A protein has these predicted regions:
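Charged docking surfaces used in two-component/phosphorelay signaling
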Residues: 34-42
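Acidic, metal-coordinating helix/loop segments flanking the phosphotransfer/catalytic sites
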Residues: 49-67
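C-terminal output helix
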Residues: 124-134
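Receiver (REC) domain active-site loop signature in two-component systems and cognate sites
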Residues: 74
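Active-site residues of response regulator receiver
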Residues: 71
Length: 138
């Protein structure tokens, strides 16, 4: 592992961002995105945020995240369309996708068949989510 240490102003050392796992959060719920960003950063991850599948796809192509957290029900390009777009453009399978959704009335198997690696219903347990990210990420 290639770690680069940097000095903080108070003299503490920390590992620079180059080796932290990059998580892309795609969700239209601004408060939830903020909560996830804060919690994931505190857990040591780099965090990228997108409010819909279109922004998420752009972030994916530019930043190449290690894991994607994806909501299904969003305006614009929703989670279903995002998964389909990944399939069509060849990005499906390049990183694990964890679906986070309060609307799991659809058969979970359909979500997995579209390319999701795992599903967590909202509300979810944050430590469980972090464990799942660690388990699925390269």
């Amino acid at each position: 592992m290639n770690q680069v240490e940097t000095q903080k102003t108070n003299g503490e050392k920390r590992v620079a961002d180059v080796d932290r796992k990059r998580i892309l959060v795609i969700d239209d719920d601004l408060p939830l995105r903020g909560m996830l960003a804060a919690a994931l950063r505190q857990a040591g991850f780099q965090v990228l945020l997108a409010s819909d599948g279109g922004e998420g796809h752009r972030a994916l192509t530019i930043h190449r995240p290690d894991v994607i957290l994806l909501d299904l029900a969003m305006p614009g390009i929703n989670g279903w369309d995002f998964l389909q777009r990944l399939k069509e453009t060849g990005f499906l399978g390049t990183c694990p996708i964890i679906v986070l959704s309060a609307h799991l009335h659809v058969e979970p198997q359909a979500i997995l068949q579209l390319g999701a690696s795992a599903i967590l219903p909202k509300p979810f347990n944050l430590p469980e989510l972090i464990d799942l990210i660690e388990h699925l990420s390269p």
